[in-house]
Regions:
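Active-site-proximal beta-strand elements of phosphoester/diester hydrolases
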Residues: 2-8, 73-80, 120-125, 151
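Core catalytic region of metal-dependent phosphoesterases/phosphodiesterases
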Residues: 2-70
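Helix-adjacent hinge/juxtasegments
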Residues: 51-54, 58-101
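Charged phosphate-binding loop/patch that engages nucleotide di/tri-phosphates or the phosphate backbone
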Residues: 144-170
Length: 170
């Protein structure tokens, strides 16, 4: 299963739509990890399973989602409610509570992937205001049973090999 994962687009609608259209025929799910700053009914948000970030005012967005992706559970949240700028520990505990092996989150605007205690944490970075690098990024997540490919792309659609990686879940 392939999943498009974006976060922290902060009001961008045209660019978000371009990214979605670029991959819509290749992915089975699209996830927005919050801070879209767009109403849930906005055209650019159509097709996205989205959560509420600290800058989102639309209460139609939930604080988190648990999605079934093949054999794996995926936990999606923005991250501000779990203090992710300081530690992933709170998010790790929540992932264990919902039996998720993969966690997608945003908030920090820092693109990166980390395996901790058998759980894969993925922050796709920001489509608008990246931190720690100049590239505005998103992720295509490819889950095949226990094998996971995490490919980072620039907003222009070019793969970023230095951020991309593969994992095998326990």
């Amino acid at each position: 299963m392939k999943i498009l994962v974006v976060s922290d687009s902060h009001g961008l609608s045209e660019e978000l739509t371009q990214v979605a259209r670029r991959h819509e025929d290749d992915v089975q799910m699209m996830i927005h990890c919050g801070d879209s700053e767009l109403p849930a009914h906005a055209e650019a948000m159509q097709g996205f399973n989205s959560v509420r970030g600290n800058c989102d005012i639309d209460s139609a967005y939930p604080d988190h989602l648990v999605e079934k992706c093949g054999q794996q559970h995926l936990f999606v949240t923005h991250g501000h409610l779990y203090n992710v700028k300081m530690t992933l520990m709170n998010l790790l505990y929540r992932a264990k509570e919902v039996d998720a092996k993969v966690v997608c989150f945003g908030h920090s605007h820092i693109a990166g992937t980390e395996m901790a205690d058998g759980i894969l944490f993925i922050n796709p970075g920001s489509l608008r205001l990246p931190r720690m690098r100049k590239d505005k990024t998103y992720v295509i997540l490819h889950i095949q049973n226990r094998h996971i490919h995490v490919n980072y792309y620039s907003i222009e659609g070019k793969i970023i090999p230095s951020l991309s990686s593969e994992f095998i879940l326990e």
